[in-house]
Amino acid sequence: MSRTRAFAVTLTIPDNEAFTAFETLGRLGLDVGRVVRADVWLFEIDGDDAELGATVASIETIHNPNKHRLSERDSDRPAAGEVWIAPRDEAPATLVAGRPIAGVRAIRRRTAWRLLDDQGADVPAAELNRAVDAFLCNPAFQVAIKA
C-alpha cells in the first residue's frame, strides 16, 4: 500500500521570490503584510520508509543545510490559508538529480504560498484568491491547489 509523505523546504536566508511577490501584490492593490514561500516535495512511497527524511535532507538539490530548513508536513495537502501551485500537465518524477530514491514510486514538487496580514494572521480567503488569480498562478500552465 502506498502513501504520500510531504516535506517543506524554506529558506533561512532572505527569500527574493517571496519579496518580489510581496512587492508585486502590493502594486496590484492587495493588502498583504508578509509573503511566505516554501517548496513542497511530495514522495509517494511503498510502506513506511522511516529513513526518507534523512534521505531527503541529504539530497543537495532539495536541501542545502547552509540556507534551507527542512520539515516534514502533517499532510500532503495545503493547510488552511495556503495555496500550492503545481504544473498543469505534471508527470511525476521518479528521480532526483538523476538518482532514484529507494522505496519512492513518484515525486512531485509544489510551490506553497501563504499570505499574512500585518498582525501575522492569514489574509482572508477572498484576498488569497485574488492573489492567486492576479499573480501567483498562471492558468495557462499551472493549477492552484487549496485546502
What is the predicted role of each segment?
Residues 1-147:
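Core nucleic-acid recognition elements
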